[in-house]
Amino acid sequence: MNIAQEVAVLQYLDIQQENPNAPNEELFNRTAESSLLLEPIEQDQLKDLVEEWMHDSNKSDSKLLSNQVSQNDNDARKNLRKRLRNDVLKDLAEEIQGCEKKLESLYEEVAKAKAKAVEDQLALEEADKEAKKAKTEAPVEAANKSLRSRKKTPEIAAPANIEPEVAPTTKTPKKRAALSNEEKQSLKKFQSAMLPMLDNISNHRFGAPFSHPVNRKEAPDYDSLVYKPQDLRTLKNMIKEGNITEVDELYREVLRIFANCKMYNGSDPANAMSIWGDECFRYTEELFDIYRQASTRSQ
């Protein structure tokens, strides 16, 4: 018998024990209508199952199915019920173990499928980068060959009395006003808290692509799609130089990094960079929430 049939027989024995004077037909009828059954069953089928189980248990005795029984027969019924209950519990335990093994197997298959999808996506991205690189390098190499084939034009020396024009140097940032001791302490406290936080984001398992500026050779169209590039290394330098001194300002700039990732790579859940950006974004929010909560408690 399967578990559902064993439960039906066990339910019959329970109802028989609770109603020792009820006729068998009523017991079979009440058992068939019980809400505790695992699946519907007809009275005739139930009767056959009860007789079959008693026969298999070497307890086949018509008196056990009737209500005219002695105390010894009642004890026999109780023993039968106990044995059947143990069988049901054993079968249920085995069924549960089987289900758990199936679930573990399914989880492993899902994890492998996800890993394979990420691996395939990375392979596609790498192939796409190689194709773009080859497409970009081909005309550049042709142009270089053309230039090398031309005759060099002699350089024209500048007159001795005219100094050559010096290319303008990079503008130096304006000197910041001298900070008071209180402002210096506040800035130092801000730096000691925020720089390690940015390091934690960089050290995240998916944080490497966001730790430095995007390589324009690998993404030549990046500036045409992203209005204001940003990266964690640049933010660390801005903090060290005192150009960012507020938590909210830093938070906005960090979010800009992941917004740029979405802008350039799209929101396709199968895109590896999109997945990495989402993971780092959630991790960043957790870090800033922890910092804000700690700051609130310390006030």
From Swiss-Prot:
Stored Gene3D superfamilies: Bromodomain-like
InterPro entries, per the entry: Bromodomain (IPR001487), Bromodomain-like_sf (IPR036427)
Ranges of residues in domain Bromo: 182-298
Top-level taxon of origin: Eukaryota
Gene coding for it: bdc1
Pfam family, one: Bromodomain
Region (Disordered): 54-79, 130-152
Broad class of the protein's primary localization: nucleus
Gene Ontology BP term (one): DNA repair-dependent chromatin remodeling
Function statement: Component of the NuA4 histone acetyltransferase complex which is involved in transcriptional activation of selected genes principally by acetylation of nucleosomal histone H4 and H2A. The NuA4 complex is also involved in DNA repair.
UniProt biased composition (Polar residues): 63-73
Location of the protein in the cell: Nucleus
SMART domains reported for this sequence: BROMO
GO cellular component: NuA4 histone acetyltransferase complex; nucleus
Assembly and binders: Component of the NuA4 histone acetyltransferase complex.
Swiss-Prot/TrEMBL keywords: Activator, Bromodomain, Chromatin regulator, DNA damage, Nucleus, Transcription, Transcription regulation
Name of protein: Bromodomain-containing protein 1
PROSITE patterns xrefs: BROMODOMAIN_2 (PS50014)
